[in-house]
From Swiss-Prot:
Present with 907 molecules/cell in log phase SD medium. Belongs to the IMPACT family. Signal peptide: none annotated. It comes from Saccharomyces cerevisiae (strain ATCC 204508 / S288c) (Baker's yeast). InterPro entries: Impact, Impact_N, Impact_N_sf, Ribosomal_Su5_D2-typ_SF, UPF0029_Impact_CS. Disulfide bonds: none annotated. This is IMPACT family member YDL177C. One of its GO terms (biological process) is regulation of translational initiation. Residues 79-98 are annotated as: Disordered.
Length: 170
């Protein structure tokens, strides 16, 4: 679900609320061009969403920014076959397009909001997926029962869902 919100973030891409033993998790993501906007974005989120302001862990987040340029490479692969008929025509040339992303000036960071290790897990997710210019935030409403390590699985699951909804992941 996408929600219109405010001045800095026009649309939040939100995951569904995941519930486990009365704890609730929800992730949101938005495009990010400048890390200096993060405090204002977080403030805007809590002001415009009263349920977030009541969460036990409002802002577990990670972000990455970079100057990204897409380069289109045309690769030619030759299929070598033993018969002369294939060598006489161009059927052995397979042209495929590969888009490579070449980031420059990468900046990144994360915050746990009291959920030790959560921000780093989110940042690792962004790094492994090679995602740039995004802010991903996970909110947790503690339900009274410790979840152990499964809380990290829930945080990652919600983050992946919102990144897919936002078009940052296929």
């Amino acid at each position: 679900m996408s929600k219109n919100v405010g001045k800095l973030v026009k649309i939040w891409n939100e995951s569904e609320v995941l519930v486990d033993r009365k704890s609730k998790f929800q992730a949101r993501c938005c495009p990010l061009q400048n890390q200096k906007d993060i405090p204002s974005i977080l403030q805007e989120l809590t002001q415009n969403n009263k349920s977030v302001s009541k969460a036990s862990h409002m802002h577990m987040y990670a972000w990455r920014t970079a100057e990204v340029s897409n380069n289109l490479h045309l690769q030619q692969e030759q299929k070598k076959k033993g018969n002369k008929a294939n060598k006489s025509n161009n059927s052995h040339v397979n042209k495929s397009r590969n888009i490579t992303v070449q980031p420059k000036n990468i900046e990144q960071g994360c915050a746990d909001c009291g959920e030790a290790g959560a921000g780093q897990r989110l940042l690792t997710l962004l790094e492994r997926a090679n995602i740039f210019n995004v802010l991903v935030i996970v909110t947790r409403w503690y339900g009274g029962t410790p979840l152990g390590s499964s809380r990290f699985r829930h945080i990652s699951t919600c983050a992946v869902e919102t990144l897919k909804k936002g078009g940052f992941l296929p």
